[in-house]
Amino acid sequence: MAYKYEWLPGSMVPDQLIEQMSKLYSSQYGRWSLKAKRNPGAPVRLQPSRIKELLVPDAARLAYAIHDSEIVGYAIAIQAKVPDYGFISWVTQLVVHEDHRQKNVGKSLLFAIWTFTDHFAWGLLTANPYAIRALEKATRRRCQPARISRNHRKLRSFAIQYVNYVNENTVIEVNRQSARINTEFPVGHSKLPEMLAAVSTPSVPWLMGPLEEGWEWFAFTFQDQAKIGLSPEEIETMLNSSDQVTKIAYSRMLLNEDHRWAHFGAVEARFIAALPGVAPGITSVLDLGCGTGRHAIELGSIGFEVTGIDYLENLVARAREVAERKHLLNVSFEAADCRKVDLGRRFDLVLCLYDVVGTYADEAENRKILANLVHHLKPGAVALISVMNLELTEKRAKHSFSLATDPDKLLALKPSGAMEKTGNIFDPEYYMIDLDTKIVYRKEQFEAGTALPAELVIRDRRYRKDEIEDECRKAGLDVVWSRFVRAGHWDEALDHDSDGAKEILLFCRRSESSPNS
């Protein structure tokens, strides 16, 4: 069952969507307690105007899920920075249609709101124990009344400022045994005992105390708490999903003016055009992992016939749009996987630039890229390849670990928004090297656009010069030359540990003994 998730600032939520949210809430939130003074046992309803009030603050955010063009779940949150402390991510409302519960819709919405590990606090007010367990799982911390009590006054002030159903007179009771707030919202608790039984185990007891009708738990976790360690199952899931996570991350790179490394398309195209045996109007070019097509478009502009391949449809769409705008009939793009695509023809020159090789932590997958590159080369044709420089990465590194023996150290790595915003993934504050495998780990935050916010663990492979030369030879390439370079200055060979030497550039020729001959 496919769901589409989106994310909007509160001020940008259209009235039509608010109407749908009101209908969903009024039909799905629950029923008033039989002891309620008004409408006992009746469905709890909420007018659009009340939802608008929750969306008024500048810090309000909406995460919602669509299925078959209908909204089936949403979460409203406040994300605001408290001076001297940091961001608080507070979910103020969560509703999921009963037909879509137990299908990870609510979990996906909540995890998106609580995903950023560098926030000061995360939480919600709720009478649902499952929501509290979701908070604990998302933030890798336990809800502990004793810890909440240390900051409950700060949280109260935050709520009075941002949450319309909390005011100066709202009663909040927090002690070592419980944390709760009287929201005077008497929803029926008939299913609460069985829910509490379901979430309580000897190893993970319920710590938040009992709950009376009209009250909700005041549930929060905090940055300075001890983290729940990575389980073997979580590590296996992380490794197995690494390729898909990386694909998501690349799709969310803004590739705008702040990505300075991507602004050298024209000068790099001139370098390519000057390579031995390469000439516009004669040389056919394949650009594997073309991204938004900056090299393909610049080469097309000076007369080359170019085909660009990338597995990200959103980047290919951007490339096609630029090519069409420039009327470049000699440039085409296709959304396909560089490891598998077979274009049914061979080229005079194949490009594979800016770390397409190295995208995968599993070296076997990178070898598939090189093998397919060779497959698409004419006999004696040439290739230009670049990968990230492991020696510079190691020289700069401040953080290292072993996933095999100390995986929890990865939890302490600081996240950054570099991949989305600048593309600078050589900042040593934000990467960690596995000493056993030399795989590089980063936590990357993505928040631009309408997709749900995400903090992803990204893995990549970087190379020493002799290693990537050896991989090229094994694939069926003769290495004509290789050098350490920086973006836009490929004609200038650098030392292996020079601060600018982030890339290794290789000019290769298809070997006569290539296995693809």
Regions found by a protein language model. Give the residues of each.
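Terminal substrate-recognition subdomain of acyl/acetyltransferases
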Residues: M1-I18, S22-S33, T115-A249
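A conserved beta-strand-loop-helix scaffold within acyl/acetyltransferase catalytic domains
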Residues: Y25-T92
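Class I SAM-dependent methyltransferase SAM/SAH-binding core
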Residues: A296-K340
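A short acidic, Gly/Pro-enriched loop at the edge of an enzyme's catalytic core
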Residues: D342-L349
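SAM-dependent methyltransferase
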Residues: L384-E471
